Regions:
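N-terminal processing/targeting junctions
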Residues: 14-15, 23, 68, 139, ...
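Cleaved targeting-peptide boundary
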Residues: 20, 24-35
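C-terminal soluble interaction/assembly domains
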Residues: 27-30, 40, 51, 301-455
Length: 455
């Protein structure tokens, strides 16, 4: 037996599953479909940069998701995501039992546990990537002349009804978010303008106060923040809920109003404009009626923010996804050229990443927000990312994305109704009903040809 095959079998035995051919595994797999998406199976050798990734680091990030999956912290959002979550738990059980794994073993783990599948929206050629980070913002526990913009916790009169929890998908698909009026009526909750104008004043919902509503907005966009208080302590806050209004990107508003060209829209540029134009910024900001409420989380300074999947995010490995398409914990291999080092998209991003968060602007099967960490440098990098990329989802081998197409029956040779009456098809009638040409009568042998006869 070849050395490579022997090593493959050893890794498979270590992980507790047989190294069987892909076709044999496919025959035992459960069919799965991705609605409103196009996808095609690919080989591992088709993934540019796959062999060069740090699979041991990726495996450690994957195990973070596994611990949350085993705790059932987040329910699935549909039939496809439910199947993926169930299959991921089986893979996680093997991974947790085998941990820790060094580089080669970790790579074999992914290759034997998953099948790569290139995925995109219907008719799409590339996915789309943006970046996000955890901002560090100055604040105060008490209102002052300098710090007057409150950061609110979730109001007790915010009610949710429907089949999905509030913290699940943005905007609230399939749920009603509002406030209760009387015993039965639910009305929309206060929008951004109403809240900024004082709708929640006097209810003791303030976690702290920030310098401006621009700071509040950017904390809400990122979904978490480190608040640097005046005594030097750091207060960590994370997304808790939102008011149910649809999210509107302020950058899109600036472009639509010809305030800023699309090519210049970055988070840093938006912040600079808002700080220089506070009155205009107020109106632009309020076009986004969505408003996020926070909760205080107890994390050490070295801990990263907690994502929607309930686990600490890993810079460069955690992504926010659309949960109507994907389950938390799902691995993706993303290929893109990104402006990480500077403004030019020349840094080759070839990396295994994991769905560990979600966000209001993340819509579609090939759309992701990459987490880059906390602080100013992470903010600069994240603010530059608006680039195309190739998405390859790593689907557990217990699921077969082409089974449905493989099992489509061929149509009968002729329509069944016509066959019952022995009716010939149009083609058969054409072939058999065309009359043969009549045979010309034989010319008498004494007849002379007209050609060349003289009168």
């Amino acid at each position: 037996m070849a050395a490579g095959s022997l090593a493959l079998l050893q890794v498979a035995a270590l992980l507790g599953f047989a190294a069987v051919p892909a076709l044999a595994q496919a025959s035992q797999s459960q069919p799965i479909r991705f609605p409103q998406a196009q996808y095609e199976p690919v080989d591992w050798t088709d993934l540019d940069g796959w062999a060069g990734d740090d699979h041991a680091a990726a495996f450690a990030a994957f195990l973070q998701s596994c611990r949350a999956l085993n705790a059932d912290r987040q329910p699935a959002t549909g039939p496809a995501t439910a199947k993926i979550a169930t299959a991921l738990k089986q893979v996680c059980a093997r991974g947790l039992a085998a941990a820790p794994l060094e580089e080669n073993a970790a790579r074999k783990f992914f290759e034997h546990s998953f099948r790569p599948l290139r995925i995109n929206k219907l008719g799409g050629t590339d996915g789309f990537l943006t970046g996000y980070y955890e901002p560090i913002i100055d604040g105060s526990r008490v209102p002052t002349a300098e710090f007057s913009a409150p950061l609110y916790r979730r109001p007790p009169d915010l009610v949710v009804s429907g089949r999905r929890p509030l913290g699940d998908v943005f905007p609230s698909k399939g749920v009603t978010v509002g406030r209760r009026v009387g015993r039965r009526e639910t009305v929309p909750y206060y929008d951004r303008a109403a809240i900024e104008d004082g709708a929640l004043n006097g209810r003791h919902l303030e976690i702290c106060w920030l310098r401006s509503q621009t700071d509040v907005l950017f904390a809400q966009i990122q979904g978490s923040a480190r608040i640097r208080l005046r005594d030097g302590t750091i207060l960590r806050v994370n997304y808790d809920s939102h008011n149910g209004w649809p999210y509107t990107a302020v950058g899109r508003v600036l472009v639509a109003r010809n305030i800023m060209p699309k090519s210049e829209v970055t988070m840093q540029r938006i912040r600079e404009w808002m700080e220089a134009n506070p009155e205009q910024a107020k109106d632009v900001r309020r076009q986004n009626k969505s408003y996020v409420f926070f909760r205080v989380v107890r994390l050490n300074a070295k801990d990263e923010a907690i994502g929607g999947g309930g686990v600490p995010l890993v810079p460069g490995r955690s992504i926010a996804i659309d949960r109507s398409f994907h389950a938390y914990g799902t691995p993706f291999f993303i290929t893109a050229d990104l402006p990480i080092a500077d403004d030019k998209p020349v840094t080759k991003f070839r990396r295994l990443v994991f769905a560990q968060d979600t966000g209001s602007a993340i819509v579609g099967p090939a759309r992701a927000d990459i987490f880059f960490g906390a602080g100013d440098e992470a903010a600069r990098i994240a603010g530059r990312i608006r680039n195309p990329g190739e998405f390859v989802i790593l689907l557990p081998r217990a699921l077969d994305p082409v089974a449905a197409a493989r099992n489509i029956p061929l149509p009968p040779e002729r329509p069944r109704v016509l066959a019952q009456f022995n009716v010939r098809t149009a083609v058969e009638s054409t072939v058999h009903d065309v009359p043969l040409p009549q045979v010309k009568p034989v010319v008498a042998s004494d007849a002379q040809p007209k050609i060349g006869r003289k009168p």
